[in-house]
């Protein structure tokens, strides 16, 4: 296990958390654009093409009817998934003006704000979506992810714990908790949570890939590569392994892995 005195760069983990709470599959059959979705930054060429086509179609729908609730939610989620957080914020600012007390709209707006780096504003918005008397697990998890991205990991984990009491078998909660531990270099705890997550309802390929990532960052490259290979084509597997080794090299952690392995 790596020394906890060596802190990893937070940027990659923030990106994964953001994707974990914000991204959706850009397809017409996506059932709910405000729930947890795919984690992953390198879609295959075929999938990327489908995403571009879906985004273009949603943009046309939005242009024709910018006040339609479903179109606002799906289009903004598609923009977030495509890395266009600023544009998603603009779309959702109009949405929350029209649908002021709509919890799904508020959650989507909070995600877009967080994706654009506006963490304090995102927290203010997500608080409007949380009913203190009956909080939803998804809203609590989203707030936790926003806090994690702002470096408030202890507060974030408290919210994940609350969310788990409401929905104990939700993979996305354990996955986000695992990434929270990864942000503070507690890779053993991160692995434990992600291993639980992959066995639960709602576990996605992205959750399994994040487990592979955490294992790889502990220097267990063969196991990491095997897990990636079950989810991705060979070229993406090797790209991910190169990324992991680059992270370790950049953070001077590979020497520690070899010393402590």
Please provide the spans of the model-predicted regions.
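Helix-start (N-cap) detector for alpha-helical repeat units in TPR-like alpha-solenoids
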Residues: 69-70, 103-104, 135-138, 153, ...
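Canonical tetratricopeptide repeat
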Residues: 74, 108, 141-142, 176, ...
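Terminal, low-structured helical/coil segments at or just beyond the last alpha-helical repeat
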Residues: 34, 205, 211-261
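N-terminal leader/linker segments that initiate helical-solenoid repeat arrays
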Residues: 2, 22-82, 86, 90, ...
């Amino acid at each position: 296990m790596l020394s906890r005195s060596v802190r990893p760069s937070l940027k990659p983990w923030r990106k994964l958390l953001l994707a974990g709470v914000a991204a959706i599959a850009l397809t017409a059959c996506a059932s709910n654009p405000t729930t947890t979705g795919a984690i992953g930054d390198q879609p295959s060429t075929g999938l990327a093409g489908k995403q571009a086509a879906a985004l273009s179609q949603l943009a046309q729908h939005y242009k024709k009817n910018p006040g339609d609730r479903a179109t606002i939610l799906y289009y903004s989620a598609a923009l977030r998934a495509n890395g266009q957080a600023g544009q998603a914020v603009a779309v959702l600012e109009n949405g929350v003006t029209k649908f002021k007390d709509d919890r799904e709209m508020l959650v989507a707006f909070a995600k877009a704000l967080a994706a654009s780096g506006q963490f304090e504003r995102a927290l203010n918005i997500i608080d409007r979506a949380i009913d203190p008397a009956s909080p939803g697990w998804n809203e609590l998890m989203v707030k936790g992810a926003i806090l994690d991205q702002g470096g408030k990991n202890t507060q974030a984990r408290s919210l994940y714990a609350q969310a788990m009491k409401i929905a104990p078998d939700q993979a996305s909660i354990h996955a986000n908790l695992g990434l929270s531990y990864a942000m503070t270099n507690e890779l053993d705890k991160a692995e434990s949570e992600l291993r639980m997550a992959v066995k639960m309802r709602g576990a996605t390929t992205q959750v399994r890939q994040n487990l592979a990532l955490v294992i790889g960052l502990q220097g267990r490259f063969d196991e990491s590569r095997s897990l990636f290979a079950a989810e991705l084509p060979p070229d993406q597997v090797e790209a991910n392994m190169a990324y992991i080794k680059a992270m370790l090299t950049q953070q001077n952690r590979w020497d520690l892995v070899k010393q402590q392995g």
